[in-house]
Regions:
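Short, ordered beta-strand-loop transition motifs
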Residues: 24-33, 68-76, 156-161, 308-311
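Glycine-centered loop/turn motifs
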Residues: 48-55, 179-182, 283
Length: 326
């Protein structure tokens, strides 16, 4: 894992290479994951490694942004997140209407606001709608909420002196099959939980008692109904606002809360080291045979974590929303 250090203007200011004690690099398909780098506290690094600098790799287009730097006992520990973290510092005040295309509507929201330095949105044409109304969020929250709802990925990449946010959704490749029996992965953990699972939101808006405004968000999809009460009294109907518009805002709150209370089926596994980043990558759909559990699953690679230390890299892959075929 060869690293480079960039300043806030994306000028390369140091070639770190593999001259670090350890590095943890994690990326999510439509989430923002963590980064940590530990180095010997040389005079050069103490001078150059600062918060809001960026770290890149020779083998990936993505970046990490440093948010915290600690110096102690002759070492520097720089930690941060994927570069998409900076989108949390850009606000959107307004409304994206139901049916708007995810990529173009978020790009428009960003371009009409206070742009982040050296960050643009790439031109994409996914033609994937977000079928709910959403208002008044950070640009990062727009990306996370809309993309997670519709299985779309987003990432910030570097292209010379500019960063670009791009949206993507790889199609299913039937040739991407992994199994312990094939020798191309080992299962680290499997977890299935309905502890916090809810699929039917009862959203309570303005008013009191029997006059309390109610809307319903049904995500049961044929499953047993699991109710979630959502107190949305903070969302008040505005002057001259239509019932349809107000209901849409309440429904959007219900969708957000249901996303926070889903059934979890997670599977973490370690792939054959040379396959990841070559045969498949973040966002690709894998077919995984879990022979010990009698399960075949299909899911996107939702997150990967790579730990580099002593010239060895350990890669762990995690998958997200899963289609189970028993």
């Amino acid at each position: 894992m060869n690293l480079n250090l960039y300043d806030a203007d994306l000028n390369r200011i140091a070639i770190i290479g593999e001259q670090y004690i350890s590095c943890l690099w994690s990326e999510g398909y439509n989430t923002i994951e963590n980064f940590t780098m530990e180095l010997v506290a040389t005079d050069e690094y103490k001078k150059k490694i600062r918060s809001d600098c960026y770290v890149g790799r020779n083998d990936r287009k993505t970046l990490m942004v440093i948010k915290t730097v600690e110096i102690a006992n002759g070492k520097i520990v720089a930690s941060g997140k994927q570069a998409g973290r900076v989108l949390d510092d850009v606000s959107f005040v307004g409304t994206i209407e139901s049916g708007s295309m995810i990529d173009t509507s978020i790009k428009k929201a960003y371009n009409n606001g206070n742009k982040y330095r050296n960050l643009e949105f790439a031109d994409t044409n996914l033609q994937i709608p977000y079928n709910h109304q959403i208002s008044n969020k950070s640009i990062l929250k727009l990306c996370e909420t809309m993309c997670q709802s519709e299985d779309v990925g987003f990432r910030v990449i570097r292209n010379n002196g500019t960063m670009y946010t791009e949206f993507y959704r790889p199609e299913h490749n039937p040739n991407l099959v992994l199994s312990e029996n094939f020798g191309n992965l080992s299962i680290d953990s499997v977890s299935i939980s309905t502890e916090k699972s809810k699929n039917y939101a009862i959203v309570l808006g303005e008013g009191e008692g029997e006059n309390r405004k109610k809307v319903y968000v049904d995500s049961t999809n044929g499953e047993e109904r699991r109710d979630l009460i959502v107190d949305a009294n903070d969302i008040q109907k505005e002057e001259n606002e239509t019932d349809e518009s107000y209901n849409s805002r309440l429904i959007a709150r219900g969708i957000e809360k249901l996303l926070e209370n889903q059934q979890t089926f997670s599977c973490a596994f370690t792939p054959y080291a040379k396959d990841f980043g070559v045969k498949y990558d973040l966002g690709d759909i894998l077919t995984v045979y879990l022979t010990d559990y009698g399960i075949t699953l299909q899911s996107r690679v939702s997150r990967f974590t790579q730990k580099s230390q002593n010239n060895k890299i350990e890669t762990t892959i995690e998958v997200g929303q899963i289609t189970i075929k028993r």
